[in-house]
Amino acid sequence: MKIYLSKINESWIVDRVRAEWYKYNPSISTEKIKEANIIWIIAPWVWKKTPKRHLKNKKVICSYYHFDFDKFGQKEKENFYNLDQYVDEYHVISEITKKQLSSLTDKKITSIPFWVNQNIWYEIENKEELRKSFDIDDEDYLVGSFQRDTEGHDLISPKLVKGPDIFIDLVKLIYAKNKKLKVILSGKRRNYVINQLEEAGIPYRYFEMVPLDVLNKLYNILNLYLVTSRVEGGPQAIFECALTKTPILSTRVGVAPEVLHKDSIYKVGEFSKAKIDIEYAFDSAQKYTIPNGFDDFLNMFNGVKIES
């Protein structure tokens, strides 16, 4: 069995997933699509870059991360079914997405969250010194958000599936009670949240695209990380918070039910009822660390019937 992973080159989480797969699973992987028995399409939005002759002649596993059915029009349906004709099995990273995908196809769907690299994401105990390195006071209450929040077409409109409006509402709620609050932002396209924070007079620090070791440090200085998405595939931030022991509260999206305690998952309008459970999240994430996090993927690929 030889597996080829489709390329994306978008400097996104999927690029890191692809690189880690090849690094830790070299004996069953190939960078040459001609040598592969299985093509793993990990970025379905660029599937057309894969030559159709290979899609026709090899087994195809396709990953999907989430569906925003509010934006799933005729064009999106046509693209899905154009790809579906070549797909043998599907992979999703959460049970929520599995339920969404099952409404579109009767093909086999396997739900396995992506692994998380504990060599990148880990707890740093000396928080005081860490904060000093960022020139942040120890008494500041830091709330983090490290995912894009703004639509790319105008760099103004909120990307509503990510819930940046919900994030702003919650930050305002916390700030009204605690003037020591500061927001820590990272990632691309944070325009909407930054504009809203400036309008509200809420202090923030923005670390745009920092190296992973710096991002790990940023997790470690937080008092709270907020996932406010309406629709989500992962996000990997849930795993990253779990391994760094960063306090996290999330809406019920993506892998949240698989990793977080049910009390750490909040409904919009009932945020005050949510409770942080760092140890529960940390313990839940252990099965997804490397190399354990590859096991279910290996089982999935071993179950694919390859014609000799």
PLM features: residue spans?
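Aromatic "clamp/platform" in nucleotide-sugar-dependent glycosyltransferases that forms part
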Residues: 230
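Donor nucleotide-sugar binding/catalytic pocket of nucleotide-sugar-dependent glycosyltransferases
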Residues: 88-100, 106-125, 142, 146-147
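A charged, aromatic-enriched C-terminal amphipathic alpha-helix characteristic of glycosyltransferases
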Residues: 272-308
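Nucleotide-activated donor-binding/catalytic signature segment of Leloir-type glycosyltransferases, i.e.
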Residues: 187, 191-210, 216
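Short hydrophobic beta-strand element within catalytic cores of glycosyltransferases
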Residues: 247-250
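N-terminal pre-catalytic "stem/leader" segment of glycosyltransferase-like enzymes
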Residues: 1-46
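Conserved catalytic-core segment of nucleotide-activated headgroup transferases in glycan assembly
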Residues: 127, 132-133, 138-192
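Short alpha-helical donor nucleotide-sugar binding micro-motif in glycosyltransferases
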Residues: 217-222
